């Protein structure tokens, strides 16, 4: 291109480099003429005089603009949310791992990690049973990890944390490893389920989501809610503490509500920066979400003896509300594309509260002259918190030697604050409170502190195949402290009132005045336990690929459990 500097006049040469400038915009005077072409240095001819009516001929020769690059580095971050990337990883993996990415989960309408693993072959979910079965093996034979670190359970009866704790808002992938390897957990017979948290993909991200919905069952029903749980799902855990005072803070009578709307709010965002003279990548990613949903179900409970005799036949109505909040933060730093440092923080709060009313025959409980008929009301809230802090690093020491290390500190608080169970038997005039330990309030709390550390040194071996051969030596440590306390208040009936199921109030009976008058008594029982667990694991593992069809994986591991 040819241009008169300081004007809009210009032209483009033909294939032989010839050009002509004339017409509007070219006036008499002195001009600097600029010549540009791809692959050549820009040439400027100074002080060329242009006169009216005279032809000016210029012969210009451009110099080649040749530059030699020492090297070209293309930096890319793989997107493990994508199904194709996960399939490529599984194809090249030495240990068979099945993984599901968040894009596939979104397409299939899956909302949490429990639903994700149910999509994997050999994994099943049984209604009414917590967590999943892998090849028929339940909770005891499986293990759960988060970004490769073990994570404790929020329930003292279970080894693994409930997978529905983890919504797809914070999941990048869910992997299921059914094969044993030296670097993994030794306490696994079914599978290790690893949940990988989200991280920033690309240069930047920002998203706000709001959704709502309703369940037709909850819209047309007077929805019952238990007392003692606020709008954020935080339960009141206050106990009376003394047997001679009835000062429970929460009511025994649930409240009625209508027009229950499911709602979900979420925001996520992140940004990638390049810092320092080497333009090292520094990124952060944040997620926060709140969810509230309602469910209503009508149930039939029927139990029989071995010879087919029915001893329990009840119908029930269950009102359930689930409230959860989550927050995720990820900070990631790459130094010269060889050293990697990352920090992950996650907070999950999950509250499930339910009111269940069951009416009918139960000869094991209501054993009397009125056809063993009775009524049971069960009010329960499970209020759980999970805090996770993880620091991980990976260093490329040489072209063949790398070092990785990490630490994770988890805090779990699982509580069942003020579970209320009341049983009423059918009588001639209506219903009366059942004697014995049938009227109960129960408080429990589990506090678990879990520290995990790991380190490994990997030496890459040369082979003629895909260069996956290596020798690895490593250490894993886990140090757990559990404290559990359960307090049970049995409110034994001495003189019962008569109730009608249509409009009965238990608060009218259970109060300080009736306790003082001897209508009922309170017995308080406390159970506690403390567990300390230290696990040290050291291992050596070797992988060598002989050809495209043969790979050797050999490992030795030592575990010490105190």
Regions found by a protein language model. Give the residues of each.
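Flexible, surface-exposed loop regions and adjacent strand-edge segments
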Residues: 50, 89-91, 224-229, 298-309, ...
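Outer-membrane beta-barrel proteins
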Residues: 106, 164, 176-190, 245-263, ...
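Flexible, solvent-exposed coil segments and beta strand-coil junctions
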Residues: 154-155, 171-173, 241-250, 303-313, ...
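Transmembrane beta-barrel wall of Gram-negative outer-membrane proteins
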Residues: 250-357, 387
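Periplasmic N-terminal accessory/gating domains of Gram-negative outer-membrane beta-barrel systems
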Residues: 18-19, 41, 47-49, 79-80, ...
């Amino acid at each position: 291109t040819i241009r008169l500097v300081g004007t809009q006049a210009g032209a483009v040469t033909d294939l032989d480099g010839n050009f002509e400038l004339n017409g509007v915009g070219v006036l008499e005077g002195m001009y600097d003429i600029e010549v540009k072409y791809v692959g050549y240095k820009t040439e400027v001819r100074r002080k060329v005089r242009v006169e009216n009516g005279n032809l000016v001929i210029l012969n210009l020769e451009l110099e080649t603009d040749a530059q030699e690059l020492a090297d070209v580095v293309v930096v890319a971050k793989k997107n493990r949310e994508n199904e194709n990337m996960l399939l490529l990883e599984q194809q090249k993996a030495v240990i068979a791992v099945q993984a599901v990415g968040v894009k596939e989960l979104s397409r299939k309408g899956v909302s949490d990690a429990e639903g994700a693993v149910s999509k994997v072959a050999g994994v099943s979910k049984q209604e009414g049973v917590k967590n999943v079965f892998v090849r028929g093996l339940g909770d005891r034979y499986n293990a759960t990890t988060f970004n490769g670190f073990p994570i404790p359970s929020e329930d003292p009866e279970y080894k693994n944390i409930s997978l529905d704790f983890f919504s797809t808002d914070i999941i990048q992938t869910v992997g299921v490893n059914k094969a044993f390897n030296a670097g993994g957990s030794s306490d696994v017979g079914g599978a290790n389920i690893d949940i990988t948290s989200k991280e920033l993909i690309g240069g930047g991200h920002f998203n706000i989501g709001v959704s709502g919905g309703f369940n037709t069952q909850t819209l047309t029903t007077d929805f019952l809610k238990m007392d003692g749980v606020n709008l954020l799902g935080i339960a009141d855990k206050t106990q009376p503490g003394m047997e001679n005072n009835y000062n429970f803070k929460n009511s025994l009578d649930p409240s009625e509500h209508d027009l229950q709307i499911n709602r979900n709010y979420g925001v996520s965002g992140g940004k990638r920066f390049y810092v320092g003279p080497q333009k090292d990548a520094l990124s952060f990613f944040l997620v926060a979400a709140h969810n509230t949903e309602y469910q209503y179900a009508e149930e039939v409970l029927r139990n029989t003896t071995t010879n087919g005799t029915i001893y329990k036949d009840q119908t029930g109505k269950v009102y359930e509300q689930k409230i959860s909040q989550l927050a995720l933060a990820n900070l990631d730093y790459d130094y010269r594309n060889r050293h990697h440092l990352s920090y992950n923080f996650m907070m999950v709060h999950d509250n499930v509260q339910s009111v269940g009313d069951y009416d009918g025959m139960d000869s094991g409980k209501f054993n009397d002259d009125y056809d063993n008929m009775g009524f049971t009301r069960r009010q329960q809230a499970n209020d759980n918190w999970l805090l996770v802090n993880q620091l991980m690093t990976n260093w490329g020491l040489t072209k063949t030697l790398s070092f990785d290390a990490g630490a994770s500190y988890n805090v779990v608080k699982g509580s069942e604050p003020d579970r209320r169970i009341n049983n009423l038997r059918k009588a001639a005039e209506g219903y009366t409170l059942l004697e014995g330990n049938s009227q109960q309030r129960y408080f429990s709390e589990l506090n678990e502190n879990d520290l995990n550390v790991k380190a490994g040194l990997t030496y890459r071996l040369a082979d003629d195949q895909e260069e996956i051969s290596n020798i690895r030596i490593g250490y894993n440590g886990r140090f757990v402290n559990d404290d559990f306390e359960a307090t049970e208040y049995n409110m034994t009936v001495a003189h019962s009132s008569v109730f009608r199921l249509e409009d009965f109030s238990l608060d009218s009976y259970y109060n300080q005045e009736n306790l003082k008058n001897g209508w009922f008594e309170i017995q308080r029982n406390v159970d506690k336990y403390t567990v300390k667990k230290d696990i040290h694991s050291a291992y050596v593992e070797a992988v060598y690929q002989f050809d495209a069809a043969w790979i050797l994986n050999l490992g030795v591991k030592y575990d010490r459990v105190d």
